[in-house]
């Protein structure tokens, strides 16, 4: 029984205890044996090749601007040095001091030997040649960047499907035999979507006058209905009162047609004022002064 109790993890008093070969914590060996899940680094070779061929237009534009600024700054610096060296008193003094220092340094044997080697080996290297090489380097950089911006990327040999071209942002409309012009990746054109939205939201002009558009279709509150009825009544009253006349004639002026004078039903003592008059319109209470005779003064 002791052997069985020991195998079952029991002591002599039949009390359960820890097994001799088991531990509460897993061992480091068991942790190392369990495989850890890791993300792969696979990349499609077609996508890698397309990204290599794609031109970064922003970077090329910045490179062109940098070269242009460097070209202008170099020319300004060279012209300033020439002007300071030849046309100023301070520049001449500085040149004389440099020549004296150079002659003093040639008195040393090592420097004199280095000067002889320099003149025999690098006699062709002068300031004009350095200026020419700098201009040539900047010009080549600008031309190379322009060629990258204006050239089309050839992707016909990559054998891409229409779905892949759409996902990669390749312009399928401008496809030619030589290649395709890639656009921004994952770019979706919104021209068709905007046109469809405009067609859906387009409302005829007659409907806009009779029934105003609301946020929800068919939703018309009592307040909105009352306002619409009042607006319709006002338009009717305005249309009926277009041909009304007053003592000074009708105030409605039609384009190109002059209004008539006061009708015969009005009072004879009221002043007759044409409607086309744009000046002062006299009041009716001073009509007796207009009809009364007054002696004119002698000049």
UniProtKB/Swiss-Prot annotation:
The chain crosses the membrane at residues 64-84, 133-153. Keywords: Membrane, mRNA transport, Nuclear pore complex, Nucleus, Phosphoprotein, Protein transport, Translocation, Transmembrane, Transmembrane helix, Transport. Pfam families: NPCC. One of its GO terms (cellular component) is nuclear periphery. The modification Phosphothreonine is found at residue 273. It comes from the Eukaryota. One of its GO terms (molecular function) is structural constituent of nuclear pore. GO terms for biological process: mRNA transport; nuclear pore organization; nucleocytoplasmic transport; protein import into nucleus; spindle pole body duplication. Residues 25-34 have a biased composition (Polar residues). Residues 1-39 are annotated as: Disordered. It is found in: Nucleus, Nuclear pore complex; Nucleus membrane. It is a multi-pass membrane protein. The modification Phosphoserine is found at residues 270, 292, 294. Component of the nuclear pore complex (NPC). NPC constitutes the exclusive means of nucleocytoplasmic transport. NPCs allow the passive diffusion of ions and small molecules and the active, nuclear transport receptor-mediated bidirectional transport of macromolecules such as proteins, RNAs, ribonucleoparticles (RNPs), and ribosomal subunits across the nuclear envelope. Due to its 8-fold rotational symmetry, all subunits are present with 8 copies or multiples thereof. Functions as a component of the nuclear pore complex (NPC). NPC components, collectively referred to as nucleoporins (NUPs), can play the role of both NPC structural components and of docking or interaction partners for transiently associated nuclear transport factors. This is Nucleoporin POM34. It comes from Saccharomyces cerevisiae (strain ATCC 204508 / S288c). The gene is POM34.
């Amino acid at each position: 029984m002791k052997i069985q109790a020991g195998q079952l993890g029991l002591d002599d008093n039949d009390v359960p205890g820890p097994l001799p070969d088991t531990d509460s914590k897993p061992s480091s060996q068991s942790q190392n044996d369990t495989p850890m899940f890791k993300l792969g680094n696979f990349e499609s070779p077609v996508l890698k090749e397309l990204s290599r061929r794609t031109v970064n237009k922003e970077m090329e534009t910045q490179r062109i601007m940098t070269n242009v600024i460097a070209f202008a700054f170099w020319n300004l610096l060279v012209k300033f040095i020439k002007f300071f060296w030849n046309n100023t008193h301070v520049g001449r003094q500085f040149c004389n001091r440099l020549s004296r220092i150079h002659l003093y340094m040639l008195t040393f044997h090592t420097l004199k030997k280095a000067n002889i080697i320099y003149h025999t080996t690098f006699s062709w290297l002068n300031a004009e040649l350095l200026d020419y090489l700098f201009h040539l380097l900047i010009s080549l950089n600008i031309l190379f960047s322009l060629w990258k911006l204006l050239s089309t990327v050839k992707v016909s040999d990559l054998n891409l499907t229409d779905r892949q071209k759409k996902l990669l942002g390749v312009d399928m409309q401008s496809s030619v035999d030589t290649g395709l012009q890639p656009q921004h990746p994952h770019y979706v054109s919104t021209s068709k979507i905007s046109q469809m939205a405009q067609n859906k939201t387009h409302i005829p002009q007659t409907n806009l006058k009779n029934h105003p558009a609301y946020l929800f279709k068919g939703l018309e509150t009592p307040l909105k209905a009352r306002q619409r009825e009042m607006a319709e009544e006002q338009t009717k009253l305005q249309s009926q009162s277009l041909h009304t006349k007053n003592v000074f004639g009708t105030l409605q002026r039609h384009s190109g047609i002059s209004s008539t004078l006061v009708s015969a039903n009005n009072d004879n003592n009221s002043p007759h004022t044409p409607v086309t008059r744009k000046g002062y319109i006299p009041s009716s209470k001073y009509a007796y002064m207009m009809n009364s005779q007054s002696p004119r003064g002698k000049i």
